[in-house]
Amino acid sequence: MGTADSDEMAPEAPQHTHIDVHIHQESALAKLLLTCCSALRPRATQARGSSRLLVASWVMQIVLGILSAVLGGFFYIRDYTLLVTSGAAIWTGAVAVLAGAAAFIYEKRGGTYWALLRTLLTLAAFSTAIAALKLWNEDFRYGYSYYNSACRISSSSDWNTPAPTQSPEEVRRLHLCTSFMDMLKALFRTLQAMLLGVWILLLLASLTPLWLYCWRMFPTKGKRDQKEMLEVSGI
């Protein structure tokens, strides 16, 4: 009986070889899992960096919106021009502040309503920035004709025709008026340059979510295509 039992137990020895093969397959699977995990780590880092960039763009929208409204208030010192009558600096700044605030609220609370409102305000901020830049261009080209003729006031019937003879007081008054108008023109040109920079930055800030979306989609599509190629090749 003992010999028969030993003969029956002998064929079971190759099972150890089967176990060794199974362990080898598990080690290959573990390597594959480690590779996938290492590939996922940069995505988490990229998502963290993109979220920080989004928060920075929202803060920039709020700060630049307030700055746009403040700079636009200074333009009411001058005569009524296109930037003053349109109120471009004020409504552009207001829309930018609302867009940044809505983005922060959606980040904290979520919800379909806040998502829709954030999208609409982002599109409105982009549109108002473009419209403000168009108005800025028109005002910069035609908004200074008043300063060139404001000091040409005389006692003659034609206001644009200087008097034949000017007294020393009239000459001094004309010189002071011209100097004052030159300083005023330089001041408002500086304010216009600052507004131009603010509106360009607002335009870029409103485009940041679109850039981040494209930046996320294109690498993901490339990795998906690479994964499909590896699956087809049998790796």
Swiss-Prot record:
Residues recorded with modification Phosphoserine: S38
GO cellular component, one term: membrane
UniProt KW Transmembrane keyword: yes
Membrane topology listed for this record: Multi-pass membrane protein
Transmembrane segments: 55-75, 86-106, 113-133, 193-213
Coiled-coil blocks: none
Pfam families: CD20
Main localization category: membrane
Single GO biological process annotation from the record: negative regulation of dendritic cell differentiation
InterPro entries in the record: CD20-like, TMEM176A/TMEM176B
Protein family membership: Belongs to the TMEM176 family.
Description of how the protein assembles with itself and partners: Interacts with MCOLN2.
Name the record gives this protein: Transmembrane protein 176A
Gene assigned in the entry: TMEM176A
